[in-house]
């Protein structure tokens, strides 16, 4: 057995890092609560309410460009210089500053300040993700790096599943935006608490044993160093894949509620569990893909491929049951999950094969959702989350 394959996952550092993954999901999904409320209170057009998501996600591109320019100017990778752990903490600090903008945004009922605050929060997330993703991959056997990312992504989707519920309860005293009685000013307290949490986690990470630098693993294989990005098709094709995946994920989440309202005459309080299941679907898929992290034994992995996804589905059921949502039409989704489990088993942990299978199933799900009706179309569109998950 090679030295690399003998490396064990650093679970202590991994658990600490997953806290920031949780925050990414918590805030991103909570935007779906802000969108309909600000649309109503500020009399926004549909395209303006969509700007809430746009302002949050576009800064990942902006942040990457800023990072690239700064690294080029310094002639050295910034995170290699300051450290990955420190980079995550700085990113959390930037996000905390963004939450402060929600105070004047609420008091002045300013749409511009609202999206500015979200932009700054997302800018901090951009730096956090730049540092955290490669750090997670480095915490053990490189061959299981993608599985550790899936596990961390599963924690991210715990945040996406419970975030909207907690934010709605904190702002409105209810889980349904349709029943909101509070004014826009009520966003101040929960986002101040969120900002404080960012700072607390930044401090905890700085004091933790999370490595500040990534140790390069020695390899006996001959390395063919290439000078141009064009020489690394897995890099630029991967960038295209991420662009498409994020576009599908965000567009589906942002418009699913409107689709159910227009085509099925659902009230906003009826829509809540469907949107929640969409986000939970990403958690279900990522937990399934992380089975290899827990054991290298094929039998154990096969068992976990069933236990983990249905455990994640159980979290969705628990959260929505506590908030008195009607889940009766959604229980049959357990059979849809079987398609994802089969695809994961067929991928055999190979990232390229997994990408091909999940992309194909995602396309099929979208086509079924477009050309069918009734619960079949709803299940198909929600299942897009399953196939965007890894």
What are these regions (language model features)?
Residues 12-44, 62-67, 163, 250-260:
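Extracytoplasmic
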Residues 22, 98, 110-128, 243-244, ...:
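Hydrophobic core of transmembrane alpha-helices in multi-pass small-molecule transporters
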Residues 31-35, 164-168, 228-290, 317-327:
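Extracytoplasmic gate region of multi-pass secondary transporters
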Residues 50-76, 276-289:
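Central cavity-lining transmembrane alpha-helices of secondary-active solute carriers
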Residues 64-112:
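Conserved MFS/SLC helix-loop-helix module at the cytosolic interface between two early adjacent transmembrane helices
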Residues 90-108, 313-329, 341-344, 361-373:
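C-terminal ends and interior cores of transmembrane alpha-helices
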Residues 144-175, 278:
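Glycine-rich segments within core transmembrane alpha-helices of 12-TM secondary carriers
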Residues 163, 167-176, 192-219, 318, ...:
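C-terminal membrane-cytosol helix-exit motif in multi-pass small-molecule transporters
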């Amino acid at each position: 057995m090679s030295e690399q394959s003998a490396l064990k996952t650093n679970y202590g550092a991994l658990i600490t890092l997953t806290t920031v993954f949780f925050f990414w999901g918590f805030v991103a999904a909570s935007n779906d609560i802000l969108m309909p409320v600000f649309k109503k209170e500020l009399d926004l057009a549909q395209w303006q309410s969509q700007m809430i998501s746009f302002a949050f996600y576009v800064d990942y591109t902006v942040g990457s460009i800023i990072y690239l320019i700064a690294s080029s100017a310094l002639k050295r990778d910034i995170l290699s210089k300051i450290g990955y752990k420190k980079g995550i903490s700085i990113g959390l600090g930037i996000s905390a500053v963004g939450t402060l903008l929600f105070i004047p945004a609420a008091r002045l009922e300013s749409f511009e300040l609202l999206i500015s605050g979200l932009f700054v929060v997302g800018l901090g997330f951009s730096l956090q993700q730049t540092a955290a993703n490669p750090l997670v991959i480095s915490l053990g056997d490189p061959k299981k790096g993608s599985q550790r990312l899936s596990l961390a992504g599963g924690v991210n989707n715990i945040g996406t599943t419970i975030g909207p519920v907690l934010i709605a309860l904190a702002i409105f005293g209810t889980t349904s935006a349709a029943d909101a009685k509070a004014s826009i000013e009520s966003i101040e307290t929960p986002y101040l608490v969120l900002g404080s949490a960012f700072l607390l986690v930044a401090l905890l990470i700085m004091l933790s044993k999370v490595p500040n630098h990534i140790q390069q693993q020695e390899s006996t294989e001959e390395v063919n160093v290439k000078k141009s990005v064009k020489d690394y098709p897995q890099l630029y094709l991967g960038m295209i894949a991420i662009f498409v995946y994020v576009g599908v994920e965000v567009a589906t989440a942002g418009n699913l509620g409107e689709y159910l309202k227009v085509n099925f005459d659902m009230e906003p309080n009826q829509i809540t569990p469907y949107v929640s299941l969409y986000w939970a679907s990403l958690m279900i898929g990522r937990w399934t893909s992380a089975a290899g992290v827990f054991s290298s034994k094929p039998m154990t992995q096969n068992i976990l491929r069933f236990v983990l996804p249905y455990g994640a589905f159980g979290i969705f059921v628990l959260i929505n049951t506590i908030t008195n949502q009607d889940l009766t039409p959604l229980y049959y989704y357990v059979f849809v999950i079987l398609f994802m489990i089969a695809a994961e088993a067929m991928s055999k942990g190979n990232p390229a094969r997994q990408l091909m299978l999940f992309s194909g199933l995602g396309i099929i799900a979208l086509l079924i959702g477009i050309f069918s009706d009734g619960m079949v179309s709803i299940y198909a569109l929600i299942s897009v989350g399953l196939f965007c998950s890894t």
